[in-house]
């Protein structure tokens, strides 16, 4: 695991999956005073290292999910074994996290280990923080991104796969509607963050050509 500070209040954990290529998996910590908010948990075997890293920064306060796929939620049950903290995702994601229905692009329901524990995100969930969530459907129906308003840092989950200079869509077969996902990417032109951070890829600085080039290259 590699822990890096991306901005004053945002830290990034990087792990690697071998499936069979090496794929980086990023999760994040948002520091607020002595408290730490965890954005995504990675898979279960990442949890112990992630917990140690979080405790070095502050006191775990809550888990915020971008969506319910296993490489984002798989470690959540381990966190809840250690800490009595709430876990949140968008309302539209809960029936998949709870195993009530499979994702529209899958045949089997998810086994998240936190069924009927995850609470719906509301405006009040983050009202005390300089953090805002935005619904960005396509990769999954209830996918969200999180924007730290002070640090101007956008945590995009699987909305994009990023390289140093370009945006790319998530893997099509793991996405419900790739064109809807690409349309959701317009959020970056609405927010205009300084830094864009994805779950799988490199940090990239925002510029006004990024999304235009992305649409031209990938939108059907």
Swiss-Prot record:
Which parts of the chain are coiled coil?
A: none
What family does this belong to? Belongs to the metallo-beta-lactamase superfamily.
Q: Where does Zn(2+) 1 bind?
A: 67, 69, 139, 158
Needed cofactors, names only, are: Zn(2+)
**What keywords tag this UniProt record?**
Hydrolase, Metal-binding, Zinc
UniProt-recorded name of the protein: Probable metallo-hydrolase YybB
Q: What is the organism of origin for this protein?
A: Bacillus subtilis (strain 168)
| PANTHER family according to UniProt | METALLO-BETA-LACTAMASE DOMAIN-CONTAINING, METALLO-BETA-LACTAMASE DOMAIN-CONTAINING PROTEIN
One Pfam family, please name it: Lactamase_B
Q: Which SMART domains match?
A: Lactamase_B
């Amino acid at each position: 695991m590699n822990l890096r500070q991306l901005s004053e209040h945002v830290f990034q954990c990087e792990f690697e999956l071998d499936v069979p290529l090496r794929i980086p998996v990023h999760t994040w910590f948002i520091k607020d005073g002595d408290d730490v908010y965890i954005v995504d948990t990675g898979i279960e075997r990442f949890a112990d290292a992630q917990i140690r890293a979080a405790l070095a920064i502050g006191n775990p306060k809550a888990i915020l999910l971008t969506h319910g796929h296993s490489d984002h939620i798989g470690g959540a049950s381990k966190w809840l074994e250690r800490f009595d903290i709430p876990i949140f995702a968008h309302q539209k994601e809960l029936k998949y996290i709870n195993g009530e229905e499979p994702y529209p692009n899958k045949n089997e329901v998810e086994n998240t280990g936190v069924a009927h524990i995850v609470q719906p995100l509301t405006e009040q969930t983050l009202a005390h923080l300089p953090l805002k969530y935005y619904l960005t459907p396509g990769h999954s129906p209830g996918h969200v991104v999180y924007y730290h308003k002070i640090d101007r840092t956008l945590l995009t989950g699987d909305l994009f796969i990023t390289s140093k200079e370009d945006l790319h869509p998530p893997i099509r077969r793991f996405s419900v509607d790739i064109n809807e996902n690409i349309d959701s990417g317009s959020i970056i032109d609405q927010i205009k963050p300084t830094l864009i951070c994805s779950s799988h890829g490199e940090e990239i600085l925002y510029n006004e050509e990024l999304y235009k080039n992305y649409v031209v290259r990938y939108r059907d």
